[in-house]
Design a protein with these regions (language model features):
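Juxtamembrane "helix exit" motif at the C-terminal ends of alpha-helical transmembrane segments
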Residues: 1-15, 91-115, 119-122, 126
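Accessory, usually C-terminal, subdomains that scaffold auxiliary metal cofactors
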Residues: 112, 132-135
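Short hydrophobic alpha-helical module
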Residues: 41, 48, 61-64, 88-104, ...
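Alpha-helix N-cap/helix-start motif at coil-to-helix transitions, marked by capping-box chemistry
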Residues: 119-122, 141-145
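Polar-ligand-bearing catalytic/cofactor-coordination segments
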Residues: 18, 22-29, 33-86, 134-136, ...
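Alpha-helical transmembrane segments of polytopic integral membrane proteins
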Residues: 3, 7, 32-42, 51, ...
């Protein structure tokens, strides 16, 4: 709800409902990216992100019907279309469009609407995530998944062999 209140502070400049929703979504995106970026600077989280990359590599190897060996896994991409990181980003994007359908005034109603619509936004975002995976091999349509893949450049790191071994198990 912090982005809602931050956006409200900009109401004298961005007074239309559409502008308020865009500003709110921008604040959500900035907070998400900033949080992940600064979190990734810590050694512990960098290691977690390496395990995350290892997990994706194993899934990619499995989906290509290759033998699951450290060598085969290490040759795979650390990015994956069905990643939870992509899902989080899609909730921001989908939320922006869903919230265009509800009023932004008064502020208390906007806060209630945001909370009440969480299941709707999550459900639509999940379907978008599934769709991006289904169309990932279709030129042009695979672009739908790119924002999530770009976010994974922050949330995954190249793993070491030991981390791949753990992911295989």
């Amino acid at each position: 709800l912090v982005p809602v209140f931050l956006a409200e502070l900009t109401r004298p400049i961005f007074s239309s409902d559409t502008a308020q929703i865009a500003v709110e979504s921008l604040f959500k995106l900035i907070l998400l990216l900033g949080y992940i970026y600064f979190l990734s600077m810590t050694p512990l989280i960098k290691r977690v992100f390496q395990y995350h990359g290892a997990e994706h590599k194993v899934i990619n190897c499995y989906e290509q019907n290759l033998p699951i060996t450290v060598e085969n896994v290490q040759n795979q991409s650390r990015l994956h279309y069905r990643c939870g990181s992509s899902f989080i980003l899609f909730t921001i994007i989908v939320g922006m469009f869903v919230y265009l359908l509800v009023p932004t005034d008064p502020l208390w109603l906007r806060v209630i609407d945001r909370v009440a619509l969480i299941p709707v936004v999550l459900g639509i975002s999940f379907e978008v995530l599934q769709l991006t995976n289904k169309v990932r091999d279709i030129p042009g349509l695979k672009l739908l998944g790119y924002p999530g893949l770009w976010l994974q450049l922050l949330t995954t790191k190249e793993p070491k062999d030991e981390q791949v071994e753990v992911a295989i198990e």
